[in-house]
Curated annotation (Swiss-Prot):
Transmembrane segments: none annotated. Residues 516-531, 582-611, 657-693, 704-724 have a biased composition (Low complexity). Specifies A-alpha-4 mating-type. May regulate the expression of genes specific to the homokaryotic cell type. This is Mating-type protein A-alpha Z4. It is found in: Nucleus. GO terms for biological process: regulation of DNA-templated transcription.
Amino acid sequence: MSLYSAEDILKWLHHAQAEFLTALAEGDDALAQFQAQWDRVRACVDCDPTLPSSTLALSHAVGISIAQIAEVMLDQEATNHTIEDELTKDLLAGLERHDASSALADEKTGAELSATPLPPYIEPCYRWLVNHLDNPYPTKAIKEELLDQARQRTSPDVAQHLALGDIDNWFIAARARMGWGDIRRRLFGGSRSLMLQSTRLMWGTEETSRDFTDGCIAKRKGAQPKREEVQPHLRSSHDVVAFKIPPKASPYFLITDSSTAACEEPLHPQSFAALQPDVEFALAHLEVNAKEMYGLEPTELADSLNSSAVDRQFATQDLVAFRAALEAATAAKQRQARREQRRAQKDRMDAQRRAEDRKCYPSPEPLSADELSGTESDEDLDDFYASDDASDDEDDDGEDLDTRPSDLMAQMCPQLVATAFSKDGSATEDEDSNSDDTDESTDDEDEDSDSENDSDSEDEEEEDEEEEEPVKIAGAKRGRNDDEEVSPLAKKPRIFSPPVRPRPQAIRVSLPSPAPSSRGSTPTSPVSPSPKAKRPAQATSLLASHPMKKREKLQEELRKAGLAPPSAPVLMGPDGVPLGTVRSRSSPSVSSPPSVSVSLPLPSRGVPSGGIKVTGDPTPWVNWDLEAHTQAPRDLTAATKSSAGCSVDAVPLPGKSRSLTRSPSISSISSACSTSSSGSDTDSLFSVTSDATDITEPDEATTADETTTQSTSASSSRDTTSQQKRMPPLSIDPRFDPALWSKYDLSPPADGRLHPSDGLRPSAFVPTKLDVRVANLAQNPARHWSASKRSPTRASHAAAPIVSYHHATGSIASPAQVAFGEGQLTSVLATGQKAGNARRRTTPVQRRVTPKAQETSEPSSLVDGILSSGLADVCREAPKPAKAPKNDRRYLERRERRLSKSSPVDSADTVRTRLAEIEQEAARLEAERQSLQRLASVGG
């Protein structure tokens, strides 16, 4: 029968862990009682088979937890014993070491004390010195008194050898050891009287004779002098504050009644900062040195000053190291300056050589599209122009050096490309080798001159080593002189005579031969230009030389050349190129068919009511006749075929020509014989090489009757074959008609399908045709307004020369009465994101200084039509009214300027003003064009 029931066992198990922890805290007796109780419960659990499984599991879990706690406690106790033993051992070892060191110190002190006895006069003299630090200069009577005291302390034999000079010498040495003379020279300029006055203020006065302990650093606050005793040069900056605000608990208050103690004035206010801080600290340091001279009791500043003081030996080493580093840095700086001087001299010589090279260059050729893509970046061009500017500023006093046009050919800008010429390879190699010899001789002369001027041979050796420093980058090529270690003294002096270079020979360029007379002869068929094309047999040699100019002058001349119209009479060569025009070079590595990029921004998904605005650069070398009023107007119709895209087609009006022709210009040689040419497609300006589409352009010399017949037949055949239902034609402004600037049929089924959702590029296109791009302005109108780019080469080798102006490049020339002016407006609007800032050429500072241009009083209806059609983005939101401050007269002007900068587009007034200015400029250009045409018609 068990001693405990199942309920008692379960209850005890629930409280077993708490009772165990309590027993651990109480001690060994409580643990013994818990152990006995645990044994009895354990026996009952083992003997009673009727206990449920939950009670057995609980007893097992409680036993495991108690066992783990007991194990942890045992480990902790063992660790504590180990730590206690280690600490005891360390403590005993430290005590033993301390005892041994103390014994050694005692032995050393005893040996020092018993080595040599001190002279008998040192003790009385030293005691007097310590008590009279305010005036360590004893009088003769005091010296005799100290001498008598010393004789009384020693034997008669030693006393008879003592003299007054021994005491004088000791005081001199004592003042030097405690730093008296150093402080007097450093702080008082060697004045003994000023130093004595400071020491009296520090430690006492002449009237009071007291022991030094009464006036030490810790007790000298009660002996402060009055204000009138302090000299002006010894007063502190805090002296006035100390006199005005005395402490409340000052011992110098005259108190008559305890109730009125706080209201009384001090009888003699004292100064609490009579000396300057640096003087006071120096005197305190002097006191410390005096107290430590013979090992007496250390003062309160002894430990702190000793710990902060720096040993003289270490201070000397640091000073020597600092001086050595300073000398090394100075020498390195001098070597760097000499290297920079030699480098600058070499750069000047290179600049002079480049200037001589540019003088013999011929006239540049225009770049092709392939070569333009392979030119240098803008950063290289900027560096090139910067070097040119630097070379122009230098004096041309150098000798004529050799020219290397092959090295400088890659540095030419895209606008000025050196004409290709042929030279013998052997001559080029000789010139290159001569130029290398010149560079080497120049470097050697520089080194020789430096070795003569520099007297320090070691410095010269280090300089030569650093001048030809080997490359440290892995994989880099090593110089040819890297392994040579020859000192400058071992080099043999070489004397070079100045090299005599021949003047560069003139470069001759072969140009096309002049064409036969345009009257009475028919021009030959144009031949497509190619890099392998042979030159005519009869070629004229032309001496061409064109010096390079600065970047600013070059841009200004190019701008003026683009604005100025060409001369009216232009003679054409047999190959269709104007005489005097140098053929463009094409890259042999990349061969791509000529194409022209044209942008067709659409304001919406469908065809706008105002027509399609065509921008870009169709071809600046093609001259479209602005007087071709007989051409057929074109209409656009739109038919939405699917949600994926829209189809835009150009459909002719009934009875008009479907084939778009181009009338020859006044300067084209083909204008005199346009009726003699036949309408064949084989001699078209562009050849079609695509197998998918075989579309060619009609000949430009087709007569009006043939054009009408062809257009009628084409339109009738197209109407019969097309079964799609089209929308009624929309009237289009003539300036937006693509038929007026291109003689190609921009039919979407043939030339490509337009996708307004993503790009805006056609899916299928003939490579040699125009590259048409359509943009949806409703999605992102600001992204598609980009500046037009001039094509660097001709799109057609047989095209007529330029008669349009630079501003009208890429615009649409309309056959209307004001066609040129409207095309001018269209071109300017397409050159920038903001119409008001499209043609600005001045800086903001110049615009502020320059008076504003007067606004056109009555702009034409064309300006209002452009603003209302949505071609130019303007700011529709009216600015909020603001009241200008009285003191700021230009507040409104600055506010308007800030608003214009924050807005992506200009205001309507700004755009209207700019359009009016463009309209006036277009009218002026139109009048000039008409005058040129009249001059050309009369022959000069």
